[in-house]
Design a protein with these regions (language model features):
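FAD/FMN-dependent oxidoreductases across multiple families
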Residues: 252-313, 317, 337, 352, ...
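Core beta-strand elements of the Rossmann-like FAD/NAD(P) dinucleotide-binding domain
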Residues: 3, 159-169
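Glycine-rich FAD pyrophosphate-binding loop
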Residues: 22-42
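N-terminal Rossmann-fold NAD(P) dinucleotide-binding loop
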Residues: 14-15
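Active-site-adjacent segment of FAD-dependent monooxygenases/related oxidoreductases
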Residues: 42, 47-125, 221
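Conserved FAD-binding catalytic core of PHBH/FMO-like flavoproteins
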Residues: 63, 124, 169, 173-284
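Helical substrate-recognition/capping region of FAD-dependent monooxygenase/halogenase enzymes
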Residues: 2-4, 8, 23-24, 33, ...
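A conserved short coil-to-beta-strand element within the FAD-binding core of flavoproteins
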Residues: 136-150
């Protein structure tokens, strides 16, 4: 069979990629090795930028709200000895101050949406589109390039049949262990084996334990069961993650019975019944691919980068990858852009992945400051794993092994219990120190700068000699601007702007379309110019579309100048700006577009031929 695009991997990034391409008239086949969507939570942080992208796909806020942890239940991040005991430290990540900050820079707020629910929302959105087909139980085996096509070998799990799929492009969205990436010979570089984790998915009603500190995350500081609870739905289900320590311990050392004992210890009470629904194990890594393209194979999402989960950046970086690539791929396939535009994908997105990877690793190491503030040495935990798993220890009776383990566990348990209860003046002082260390972790949970603040450079941006402003804290804050390369800023529209029920400037962006927006003397010309460009361009007069307050913001973002024309790419990043006294001519705007798309003016105006794309 032959398809325009073959996408391998039906996780959130692959599903998003297929939907974005479909909306631009590009057909795809999406194949997935699993026999269906994920059934358990994995990633769960959905950032403001990701929600903007999902909204562009027509996914309504109401659809996400039905599967989102209520903000009131995800207000804090808390540290306890176990889930049943009192807080040792707590920080607020979902308070009003943070919402005010988010609302000033985006029309969407970040949310906790468990991945298996997000996949279902995306799959349902994809099912309503033409130009895309999804097949489960299909394993990608190999590929080779033949001229301007890639021939992939796919194995059907049900029949065992191996069949060929010819495509113009092959997209690897098959996760951190990507077979497609390995097949393309693309290497990953970075930190390996940062940690090894067992994940316990379980059902329980945790409301009696968490009602006084409604938190999305609870860190348990018990030596019996150190780890992290992710409380997606306190009434129904949650996740517990705990480390193990190769080579002394292996996943096989954690059967259901042992995980039940560890989970009971982490809960800290026998009063809460639970049922383990699944177990998994994984290795925490921090890798970024050397390149995002090899011939006609492109990497997106975790196939291109894998981060520690500390920061919740992985899924969101992947969704933004798809958003950056989809419009470029569509225009190249439609003959409206030169193939060099594809190379700007890796040039723009790889630096973002490197920055997000570094931030995630920093967060991971910084979390140790909390246990260090308690006077606990994390290095004792691998030693415990070594002792309890050594050959001599395994030969001992269970009671003796427990006694040996107790030599390591008891001092830590005694210390954390006294600190939690502030049992002495010294313990109270330590608890205050732990609280300060916890408060110093906010960069882990507030990453709006990383989410919205990056500005692209390179061939797909026509710079004007200015540099996008950078916030004093580029992780937690963002400075909006009209600088080429920056994200199109969020501002409020006028009530009578002709876009009923739309409040954010991002509602002006139409999938697969450029936006030509003008202010001051440039405004009226932009609507006229947009209709003459021979490409999908929406023209907007910002003097009419923006609210009165927003116009003042726009002038400030434009370095105090009242006149400007802004060409915004389909992925919502500013491609070009003119601040000349007079509006730009059609030739000037066409020249900017042609430079970005790497084509001649004659190709810009030629009729669109989509017959090979569907």
């Amino acid at each position: 069979m032959e398809v325009p695009v073959l996408i391998v991997g039906a996780g959130p990034v692959g599903l998003t990629m297929a939907a974005l391409l479909a909306d631009q008239g590009i057909a795809s086949l999406l194949v997935e090795q699993r026999d269906g969507l994920h059934q358990a939570p994995q990633a769960h942080v959905v950032s403001a930028r990701t929600r903007e992208i999902l909204a562009s796909l027509g996914i309504a806020d109401e659809a996400l709200a039905r599967v989102t942890t209520p903000p009131a239940d995800a207000r804090y991040v808390t540290w306890r000895r176990n889930l049943a005991e009192e807080d040792i430290a707590r920080i607020e990540i979902g308070g009003e101050a943070r919402f005010v900050q988010l609302d000033s820079v985006s029309g969407k707020r970040s949310a906790n949406v468990p991945q298996h629910h997000l996949e279902r929302v995306l799959f349902d959105a994809l099912a309503g589109r033409t130009h895309c087909e999804t097949r489960f139980g299909q394993t990608w085996r190999a590929a080779e390039e033949e001229g301007d096509r890639v021939v992939s070998r796919i194995e059907d799990a049900a029949s065992g049949e191996v069949y060929a799929v010819r495509s113009q492009w092959l997209l690897a969205a098959d996760g951190a262990s990507s077979s497609v990436r390995r097949g393309a010979g693309i290497a990953m570089a970075g930190d390996t084996n940062l940690a090894h984790m067992v994940t316990v998915n379980f059902e329980a009603d945790l409301r009696p334990l968490v009602k006084d500190s409604p938190s999305i995350l609870f860190w348990t500081l018990s030596a019996k069961a150190p780890g992290t609870f992710i409380v997606h739905d306190a009434a129904r289900y949650a996740v517990f993650m705990t480390p193990y320590f190769p080579p002394h311990e292996q996943p096989a050392d954690f059967p259901v019975a042992r995980c039940e004992r560890m989970l009971r210890a982490a809960l800290g009470t026998a009063e809460v019944p639970f049922r383990i629904t699944s177990l998994s194990h994984w290795t925490m890594q921090a890798h970024v691919a050397d390149r995002y393209r090899q011939g006609r194979t492109l990497l997106v999402g975790d196939a291109a980068h894998r981060f520690p989960p500390t920061g919740g950046l992985g899924l969101n970086t992947g969704i933004a990858d798809a958003h950056n690539l989809a419009w470029k791929l569509a225009l190249v396939m439609q003959g409206r852009a030169g193939e060099g535009l594809i190379d700007t994908y890796g040039a723009e997105r790889r630096p973002v992945a490197v920055a997000n990877c570094e931030a995630s690793v920093k967060n991971f190491h910084k979390m140790r400051e909390v246990t260090a503030a308690m006077g606990i040495d994390d290095r004792r935990l691998p030693l415990l794993g070594r002792v309890r798993s050594s050959a001599p220890a395994r030969a001992l009776p269970g009671a003796v092994r427990s006694a040996i383990g107790g030599l390591f566990v008891a001092p830590v348990e005694w210390r954390t219990r006294r600190i939690a209860k502030a049992a002495s003046v010294r313990c109270a002082a330590i608890r205050q120190r732990v609280q300060r260390a916890a408060e110093d972790q906010m960069a882990h949970f507030s990453t709006v700068g990383l989410d919205l603040g990056h500005a692209y450079e390179g061939a797909a941006v026509r710079g004007d000699g200015t540099t996008a402003p950078v916030a004093p804290d580029p992780v937690r804050d963002v400075c909006q601007s009209l600088t080429p390369g920056a994200r199109w800023p969020h501002f409020h529209l006028a009530p009578d702007a002709g876009v009923a029920y739309r409040t954010s400037s991002h509602e002006l962006l139409k999938p697969g379309h450029f936006l030509l927006a003008g202010m001051g003397r440039h405004g009226p010309a932009c609507e006229r110019l947009a209709a003459s460009l021979g490409l999908a361009v929406v023209g907007v007069n910002l003097d009419l579309a923006a609210s009165h307050k927003a116009l003042a913001q726009l002038i400030a973002w434009n370095d105090g100048q009242t006149d400007a024309t802004l060409l915004v790419r389909p992925d919502g990043h500013i491609a070009w700006r003119s601040t000349a006294p007079q509006p730009p001519s059609l030739d000037e705007v066409s020249a900017a577009l042609c430079a970005i798309l790497q084509i001649t003016p004659s190709r810009l105006l030629q009729p669109l031929d989509n017959k090979d794309m569907q």
